[in-house]
Amino acid sequence: MDSKRKNQELSTSETADPSLSKTNKKQKIDMQEAMKNQNEVSLLLVGKVISAVAKNSNCVFSPASINAVLTVTAANTDNKTLRSFILSFLKSSSTEETNAIFHELASVVFKDGSETGGPKIAAVNGVWMEQSLSCNPDWEDLFLNFFKASFAKVDFRHKAEEVRLDVNTWASRHTNDLIKEILPRGSVTSLTNWIYGNALYFKGAWEKAFDKSMTRDKPFHLLNGKSVSVPFMRSYEKQFIEAYDGFKVLRLPYRQGRDDTNREFSMYLYLPDKKGELDNLLERITSNPGFLDSHIPEYRVDVGDFRIPKFKIEFGFEASSVFNDFELNVSLHQKALIEIDEEGTEAAAATTVVVVTGSCLWEPKKKIDFVADHPFLFLIREDKTGTLLFAGQIFDPSELSSALDRA
């Protein structure tokens, strides 16, 4: 995001439905500070999710999808405790502020760019409400016109399983059939009152594609001392790489659309120098605000040995162990999938909240090696806003998943 946009202050009346406010006062929102806070929350989520449900295993999830579904939930609940918890977790002072961030991301980051040669992006929201409950007319208007969400009144009391299957079909349809079952059996019951859902799909081509004829099977070293043979993409092209104390960072830009002047998407790989040091690197990254922005490779450099593995992983989890203060009869489910190959990246995530009753031109000449043959962290990020679309880690690229039963 350019400096003018980042420093622009948006009034609540420009970004949110006025029905959300109890007063007619226009609350000025510093979008730069609000976005900074939400990006810090996303980074905290990376650390929380990995430490709670993906220790030393493959994972992928979407912080952006979780933030979106929490925003919709907070804006449309009478449960003051739930709203207060979400706002505290998102480091936000009001639903007006979270809605303003949602509006900014929807109009800039999550706009589909495939027709002009950029990434294909789809970000959709859905709300399912128990039909016997009364609904504030302002909420329904907010769902449909502000959040652009599909909205349905359903019979949880007698047809909970049918609703669960409908939500799963909705998630599958909006993630290009990548996410088949966001809600596992038993997650929706006759006590369910609301389901808030968000589905995010991303498919981007590398700015410089890899030559498939150069891909070779090589060993990837596991933590247990063994290794697996997996296909590695190789290149002799200059790459955005920077070496730091104990680790290296690779930035792989995605091809931009012709009108993508306000956004830039990249994948980042964070590779520790030693194979057993990923946990320590993750701690450094997630405990230091501003770490990502201060560790971005700025120049393409000549490469020596350059190899990154192809991989496809799927990961699902229920977030009660992540939100350990979330004792509010609410469960949050997410499932995500990502595939990396010579052409680019395809990734998708679906998240649901289930609410139940009760609640310069210089560049160095020295060649740099980047051999991702041991565990590493990856992020997909929109660089101008700092938005984290997807995050994860690879411990064994030969495995499709090791945690699908956690959803």
Curated annotation (Swiss-Prot):
Family annotation (CDD domains): serpinP_plants (cd02043)
PROSITE patterns per the UniProt record, alphabetical: SERPIN
GO annotation, cellular component aspect: extracellular space; nucleus
Known role: Probable serine protease inhibitor.
Highest classification ranks of the organism: Eukaryota, Viridiplantae, Streptophyta, Embryophyta, Tracheophyta
UniProt cross-references to PANTHER family, sorted A to Z: SERINE PROTEASE INHIBITOR (SERPIN) FAMILY PROTEIN-RELATED, SERINE PROTEASE INHIBITOR, SERPIN
Transferase in keyword set: no
Region (RCL): 344-368
Recorded GO MF terms: serine-type endopeptidase inhibitor activity
Domain notes per entry: The reactive center loop (RCL) extends out from the body of the protein and directs binding to the target protease. The protease cleaves the serpin at the reactive site within the RCL, establishing a covalent linkage between the carboxyl group of the serpin reactive site and the serine hydroxyl of the protease. The resulting inactive serpin-protease complex is highly stable.
InterPro entries registered for this protein in UniProt: Serpin_CS (IPR023795), Serpin_dom (IPR023796), Serpin_fam (IPR000215), Serpin_sf (IPR036186), Serpin_sf_1 (IPR042178), Serpin_sf_2 (IPR042185)
Family named by the database record: Belongs to the serpin family.
UniProt biased composition (Polar residues): 9-22
Gene Ontology process terms (BP): DNA damage response; DNA repair
Pfam families, per database record: Serpin
Region entry Disordered, spans: 1-28
Highest taxon in the source lineage: Eukaryota
Keyword terms: Protease inhibitor, Serine protease inhibitor
Keyword Glycoprotein recorded: no
Annotated organism of origin: Arabidopsis thaliana (Mouse-ear cress)
Site feature: Reactive bond: 358-359
Listed name of the protein: Serpin-Z2
